């Protein structure tokens, strides 16, 4: 199955975690970086374009600053990232030079991709770099990003970059073999799961929520990233980054790590951007009838089915649409502001102009701007 699925891969996003890139003491593992660059250069020689999403800046900076703190404050992390990012890029460039590869640094915040124009500009830049034969190395701009504009972790960032770059495969390299049925560190009966056809609640339970003091992501964030990529129609492989030949083996379809299959109901580019790149500014609460119409019939959200609104937001912002029990069922771009929705909630569309004195349309969220999240 793997070879058949991956034989058409021509562009891959590779995410490398901090534990893969650092030695036990916390500094950069230059041998590991050199090996990974050798393998990425090998893909380039096969005509496969590579985009690298790399962690490790904070860890490199902390080591350079000789910080003994296991837990850093946000300002300390930002300072460590500022010191570590050029060290990380220098390591990649030195390792790529012997292959004639030029590396290109791209630092992003969630705010960059939430703005549609900047999202498209970032895509254009990526295309230009790949056309020129460069290796884009992407990281979150930790030195300036605060909670409101952070991706959260590079696993999430790698899934968004997969959509941004319209890649054919997401390869996440971590410090364990793949997804296990239980935590292999504490359960001797834990078994490696080689194939995940669909990311169910049971799969999410297996992923747990563990992380480390080196990176910010645990297995749960990797499964979430695989889910986001799957809805874009892209498979994800979770594989052991310290294993020599891992990139070559994974991309060529060998049995390594865990393969997450793409979803059968993949989203188009714009809807994927709405669902996973935009940060919801509020909630719109709906009744059971509206929920059924959205989920079963794929309709737009009308004011008559709205029971309430939470948060303050302007027209055009992304909102969560939640059912009677509070569960998120969809996300979409609101055609009315929160204050306007409060006034028209529960009323028929024909009454909007009478209530507001104007109307933008019959829908609060049009179906073209609405994405069901029931599979997410």
Curated annotation (Swiss-Prot):
EC number assigned by the record: 2.7.2.11
Matching Gene3D superfamilies: Acetylglutamate kinase-like (3.40.1160.10), PUA domain (2.30.130.10)
Top-level taxon: Bacteria
SMART domains attached to this UniProt entry: PUA (SM00359)
Biological or metabolic pathway of the protein: Amino-acid biosynthesis; L-proline biosynthesis; L-glutamate 5-semialdehyde from L-glutamate: step 1/2
Gene Ontology BP annotations: L-proline biosynthetic process
GO terms of molecular function: ATP binding; glutamate 5-kinase activity; RNA binding
UniProt keyword Kinase present: yes
Main enzyme class: transferase
Name of the protein described by the UniProt record: Glutamate 5-kinase
Encoding gene (name): proB
